[in-house]
Amino acid sequence: MKPRRLLCAMLALCLLLCGCGQAAPVDPPAGQIGEPHYPEMAPYPNETLFFNENSGEFDGDSFSLVYDDWRESQQNQYNQPEGYADSLSGFFRESIPDFLAASEGNAACSPLNIYMALAMLAEVTGGTSRQQIMTVLNAADLTALRTQADHVWNAHYCADGATSCLLANSLWLEEGLTYDPNPIQALANLYHAATFQGDLGTPELDGMLRDWLNEQTDGLLEDQVNGVSMDPQTILALASTICYRAKWSTEFSEQANTQGVFHAPDGDRQVTFMNTVQTYGPYWWGSDFGAVSLRLEDGSRMWLVLPDAGKTPADVLASGEALELILGSWAETENQKALMVNLSLPKFDIVSDVMLNQSLQSLGITEVFDAGTADFTALIPQGGPCWLDTVQHAARVAIDEEGVTAAAYTVMMTCGAARPPEDEIDFILDRPFLFLITSRDNLPLFAGVVENP
């Protein structure tokens, strides 16, 4: 029998581009013993199909019928109880600085993806190991965590062909061991998790895991996925992914792009800036930063946070004021004003690949990493000592003139500033800055630091 070693790897990828789709269903591969079930969503109607090429007329009545079906499908998917995620704001505000600090230079993470992975981890643990996870996630008990995670998943899943926010999870089990079916069923029902079983740590199972990760993240983290493997001692793996793509509500014009200098920590460099003017767009400020947001077609926002001169993104994260505003009080704060904002934003494509063991332990999740205290009896009732060995998180974020693409996956394997001017401001992101992509429910899908676009 294998030693009870747990390896946890978290990887996240986030890009800003256009268009993404979930792969078509296929027959379960060898080793897959449970298939995920995803909600059916009506596709967004293609306007071009309702134009008569001969007359040039638009069939508005037919389009309205299809549009109404799509809209009803969206509302049914997103209709979650008011305040379902209120208790998560503290977790996100506290954890994002730790997650980003794990990277040097450019940094990116998917807080939502990490939340889903930790919620799944709570399902397979017990005792104090589980309690520490629930305390960090501000969950009163497992029932409350399950209810909240279910709402979070459904509120953010979208596969309508216009905007994509595809969430996927999987559970990987060692063959020959006895597992309690209850947490496996909970992961399938609430987290839409596929289940695989085989000889973990062999080339065959490593290849299946990498194929699954690449498929769910649309190949956006292929280089990072190539480094994922399970130790022969691994007896359990959890994997969680997110693939997100959306267009700007108002796209940037490529003709307005300019070449300019970005003042990176390691020296100035020429980059391409995308430029636009927000007429009376909201501008926010705090004691050490200024911020604007760009709307996306799905109701999400990309927040751009520029530290004051002499301040760094790490300073802004440490103060917590910007995260408090973005994840909480941005709509009510007095530190906002409608201005004409001349925005210059560098195009970027950044990647992170880090270990989060220390970050999670600093948040208070410690017992699962210790073979002497880790409790995985919820899933492995008769098992010997087992522990969480490694937590790896990789993320990628890219933006262009059209919009945002983001993807993430988590694998757990067991074995200012002064008040702005009156009317107009130049918001030029030509030095290191922060960004957050928040959903329509104001949960952080992705966060990052751009030091060298």
Question: Which role fits each region the language model picked out?
Answer:
Residues M1-C18:
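Sec-dependent bacterial lipoprotein signal peptides
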Residues M10, C20, P25, Q32, ...:
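Non-catalytic interaction/Regulatory regions outside core domains
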Residues N106-R130, S293, P421-P453:
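Feature captures eukaryotic membrane-trafficking machinery centered on endolysosomal pathways
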